[in-house]
């Protein structure tokens, strides 16, 4: 049986990046990378540091992204739902909240069998009428939910700045 030997001058507090297998860091529904199945760093070498999981662009950066935007004339939410068909998605407005729900039962893919489900909630800004909200699904699997913002009534007005000679903050008396 092999035993990893650590040199006495290498102390664990100085190696905060030492980490065991990243098997549980995976994003559910995505396949494992070969590096997820490598032995832990201590069995390889005391000098080996596994790269952080957030650097794995294909499985981390590509899927499940959600972006909410509040622009001058509209409010929009873009959500990556490429693993779901339109029949497996629901978009509802409850009061001042948009709820997006997606669910598909177990089915086979290239890695085995998988089922997925998610719930997302987004607060509707006060200047967006919930009755005007619409949704659409693009060909590449991005769900867009948006609504127009109410225009501010009244003309724009510039407010003049006056200068005062006394300070806004007075010094506290010294003890």
From Swiss-Prot:
Transmembrane region(s): none
Main location: cytoplasm
Listed Gene3D superfamilies: 2.60.40.790
Cited SUPFAM superfamilies: HSP20-like chaperones
Site (Susceptible to oxidation): 48, 60, 68
Subcellular location: Cytoplasm; Nucleus; Secreted; Lysosome
Reported tissue expression: Lens as well as other tissues. Expressed in myocardial tissue.
Modified residues (N6-acetyllysine): 92, 166
Ranges where the sHSP domain occurs: 56-164
Sequence segments annotated as region (Disordered): 146-175
Residues given in the record as Zn(2+) 2 binding sites: 104, 106
Subunit description: Heteromer composed of three CRYAA and one CRYAB subunits. Aggregates with homologous proteins, including the small heat shock protein HSPB1, to form large heteromeric complexes. Inter-subunit bridging via zinc ions enhances stability, which is crucial as there is no protein turn over in the lens. Interacts with HSPBAP1 and TTN/titin. Interacts with TMEM109; in the cellular response to DNA damage. Interacts with DES; binds rapidly during early stages of DES filament assembly and a reduced binding seen in the later stages.
Disease: Myopathy, myofibrillar, 2: A form of myofibrillar myopathy, a group of chronic neuromuscular disorders characterized at ultrastructural level by disintegration of the sarcomeric Z disk and myofibrils, and replacement of the normal myofibrillar markings by small dense granules, or larger hyaline masses, or amorphous material. MFM2 is characterized by weakness of the proximal and distal limb muscles, weakness of the neck, velopharynx and trunk muscles, hypertrophic cardiomyopathy, and cataract in a subset of patients.
Family: Belongs to the small heat shock protein (HSP20) family.
Protein name: Alpha-crystallin B chain
Gene it is expressed from: CRYAB
